[in-house]
Amino acid sequence: MNQTIIVMSDTKDLDDEHQIVNELFENGLEIFHIRKPKYSTQEMRRYIEKINKKYHNRIVIHSHHELCVSIKLKGIHLTERHRRKNFFRPWFLMQWIKFKRPDAIITASYHSPNSLLKHNPGYNYIFLSPIFDSISKIGYKNTFNDDSLEVALKKTNFNVIALGGVDYSKLEMVKKFGFKGCALVGSIWHTQNPVSEFIKIFDKWNLLENSVSV
C-alpha cells in the first residue's frame, strides 16, 4: 500500500460541505470516507450524488454498504460496531461485495495495538485510533504506549492508518511510528479553511515521504 492521506467526513452536516469535498479531490485527495451514522440510505445516496461523479471511485462508505455496488464507489468500511453485532454478517457482506465488485476495497476500525496482531480477514487497510487526543471528539484521548505501538506496527499484517488527533504538527510522529498513512477529521473540518489546511498537510506529508525515500 502506498503511503496516503485520507480525509473522513464529520458526522454532522456542515456548511458548503460538498463544495469543500470536491475541492479536496481537486487538490490531490485520494480517498474520502463518508461517516454519517444517522443517514438513511436515500440521504447517503443524495450526499454522494452531490459529489462530482468522476470522484466516486475515491469514496468509501461506513454505512448503507449496498450503495458501493449500485454507485460503484471505492469501497466499504466496517466499524467495530458492525463486527461486534454479528460475527457472520460482516463475513457474508465482505463476500458479497467482493463477488459484486471484485475491485472494491474493504476497511475496518480498531482501537488497541493488540488488535494489530490478529489475523487479517482481508482488509485493505485499517484505522487505529485514537493515536493522539481527538480534535473532533471531546474527551476522546490517546491511551497508547509509544513503545508497544511501534512494536505492534512492526509485527502486524495490516496496513495501518493513524486516526485521531492527526494534524500538521503530528505528521513526523506518524511517520516515526511506522503507519502506512493518516486520516484527517477535526484538523480539516474544525478549521476556518479546510481546503487550505488540507493542502498544507498534503504538501508536508509528501515532503516527508520524499525525504525518506531519498
Protein language model regions, located:
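Conserved N-terminal beta1-alpha1 strand-loop-helix module at the mouth
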Residues: 1-87, 91, 98-125, 151-158, ...
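Non-cysteine beta-strand/loop elements that form the S-adenosyl-L-methionine
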Residues: 124-132
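A short acidic, helix-capping loop that chelates divalent metal ions and anchors anionic groups
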Residues: 132-138
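Glycine-rich S-adenosyl-L-methionine
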Residues: 145-150
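Short, glycine/charged-rich "phosphate-handling" switch motifs in NTP-dependent
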Residues: 180
